[in-house]
Amino acid sequence: MFNQSYLNVYFICGTSNVPSHRTIHEVLEAALKAGITLFQFREKGESALKGNDKLVLAKELQHLCHQYNVPFIVNDDVSLAKEINADGIHVGQDDAKVKEIAQYFTDKIIGLSISDLGEYAKSDLTHVDYIGVGPIYPTPSKHDAHTPVGPEMIATFKEMNPQLPIVAIGGINTSNVAPIVEAGANGISVISAISKSENIEKTVNRFKDFFNN
């Protein structure tokens, strides 16, 4: 069952997003201990794990998340999400259609990326629990990212659909969260702000403070 508070501090990570001196297991566990509210396994890039290696890692990270009662979301990979019985799946505009995914994930969390009004207009939100809006700011984590849309886009979507849970993504760090919260976002999703943080506990707690007031 989806709860929009899951979106508060939503950590996204894959093996290519962690510093060379740390493992993804270490980074994720530090983030879980600090209190992230949702985790998305996003294994992308030239060095991304595939096949059984990806499956084994997904199961290990899922087990870690469940030890801390944090839902485990899979990015894009429908077959992987089904195989490990993930808590949910997040897809982009170019991925499998949400309606088809909903047939397999009737009791799971479904997220959809939307970057502008055009994508919003053509998106089927019937089966979607939340939308990921962005990139809000310029981001180094996604080389194929759209042009930044700013916090204003969140306010626009909230005005159009006040009940739709929204998580902001793209270039977010502890110093630029305030405008996103003011725009009405239910949470923030980050990659490098946590994965490359020198003090993950401090970073996560600063993010949490914006949604605990």
UniProtKB/Swiss-Prot annotation:
Pathway: Cofactor biosynthesis; thiamine diphosphate biosynthesis; thiamine phosphate from 4-amino-2-methyl-5-diphosphomethylpyrimidine and 4-methyl-5-(2-phosphoethyl)-thiazole: step 1/1. The keyword Membrane does not apply. This is Thiamine-phosphate synthase. Pfam families: TMP-TENI. Keywords: Magnesium, Metal-binding, Thiamine biosynthesis, Transferase. InterPro entries: Aldolase_TIM, ThiamineP_synth_sf, ThiamineP_synth_TenI, TMP_synthase. HAMAP family: TMP_synthase. GO terms for cellular component: cytoplasm. It comes from the Bacteria. Condenses 4-methyl-5-(beta-hydroxyethyl)thiazole monophosphate (THZ-P) and 2-methyl-4-amino-5-hydroxymethyl pyrimidine pyrophosphate (HMP-PP) to form thiamine monophosphate (TMP). It comes from Staphylococcus aureus (strain bovine RF122 / ET3-1).
